[in-house]
Amino acid sequence: MRSFLRYFSSVKEATQFRFESCRVENKSYIRLLGPDSIKFLNGLVTSKLQPNFVKKNLTTISTKEQEKNNTLSSLNFSKYNWGIYKECTRLEDHISRFGTYTGFLNMKGKLLTDSIIYPYPFTLKSIQDKKFPEYLMEFDSHIAQKMERTLDNHKLLSKVKFKHVQNEELRTWDAYITMPEEYQLLENLLNPMQEMKDGEQALHFANFFASMFFQGNEHKLKAVYFDTRLIDDMYEGKIKPMFRIVTDNSVSDINDIFNCTAFGENPFEKANISATEIQKERFKFGLFDGNHEYIPETLLALEANFDYFEDSINSDKGCYVGQELTARTFATGVLKKRCVGITIDEPQKLADWDHSKYLSIFSKLELQVQNQDTQAAINPFGSLSKPVKKRTRPAGQLINYNGNIGVAVVRKDYIYHALKHHHDIDAYVELPNKETVACSIKLEWLDRFLEETEAEEVEQEQ
């Protein structure tokens, strides 16, 4: 917390402060509360929402790790509105009041829907103002009732209550908060955030964030999610810091309640952006926002890159719906496809696609390899049969698109080849009428898979 305060008290004069926002129209919420809330959710989603500690030999555990275990294990997760536990890959494990991006799987391990789980409400006077933990679960509006039935089917004897929040009660917004690079917004937001080890600390941080950026309107903020799915890309400046903000229905434009004078002589410029712009930015990096963007139960969570996200999936959390295949994939490392962004040369040709099935993507690289492999089959009676041409395997499938940017699930061997030989993947989408549309997977959008590629190459050499 001290570093966060120190940062905001030492900002120098600048002009590149921007707050850009967009209304998100298709979201609905289910409100969940009760002493078993976290235990209940932990058995349904891919994120690890409560810590479990394995006893270790005292000579193998560090003092720092032991202190962290002692602090987190002493928390009572069934009492008061303490927030949400985040077990991270790059950040330290911590308690937060910012939401968690997660997934609900079917019994076969396929993604039913992605979701955001928010501690609710975002700000309070004290965590003891509420007797039990309380959360909002965000879903696309068209599946909210189905997910409510799913929750009801799994409730059994769990001490939880949930109900669908009427759509007119809440409003959802996407917002970018950007500042000049020298002010290190990410470091000074994430560093103090990961220091929060109990509910009161997390609440103090949330209250400070709300008063800094929404002074005088803190009570209108009901939930906040800081999109940390691709932290490394944010640090490299490829992705702008994105926030999903849920307000009450009194807010007609979130720009009106944003505190543009938070830094005194450095006022924020405020602007509205379109949902199209935001979706295209996400698609570049293979990111989804609700199952209206893909066909439910067609993707594995790891194919959707959940293992690259900060706190969205965990390999050792124990039992949850769909856990068996996911755990096996983690253990064996056998995963054949990944979701990536693509560029599309003539997107108007896709206008009649009804999205009921993914469209096959073929790569010119595959055709070259297969043409070399085509050979005559040997006839045991002495004559040669006609050459047998292998069936061309798709390099991947187009999942969705917006204008000239799409998101596709692509075979990893193509991704690895592109990274190894430093080239884009030139390909084409095949329409149902066999017409083709040229597309390309940009090398710059594949950087995050480089370490995975190198690790698998080492394993193959051994």
Swiss-Prot record:
InterPro entries: TrmE/GcvT_dom1 (IPR027266), YgfZ/GcvT (IPR045179), YgfZ/GcvT_CS (IPR017703). Residues 1-15 form a transit peptide. Signal peptide: none annotated. The keyword Mitochondrion applies. Keywords: Mitochondrion, Transit peptide. GO terms for cellular component: mitochondrial matrix. It comes from the Eukaryota. Its main location: mitochondrion. One of its GO terms (biological process) is iron-sulfur cluster assembly. It is found in: Mitochondrion matrix. One of its GO terms (molecular function) is transferase activity. Gene3D superfamilies: Probable tRNA modification gtpase trme, domain 1 (3.30.1360.120). Belongs to the GcvT family. CAF17/IBA57 subfamily. This is Iron-sulfur cluster assembly factor IBA57 homolog, mitochondrial. It comes from Kluyveromyces lactis (strain ATCC 8585 / CBS 2359 / DSM 70799 / NBRC 1267 / NRRL Y-1140 / WM37) (Yeast). The gene is CAF17.
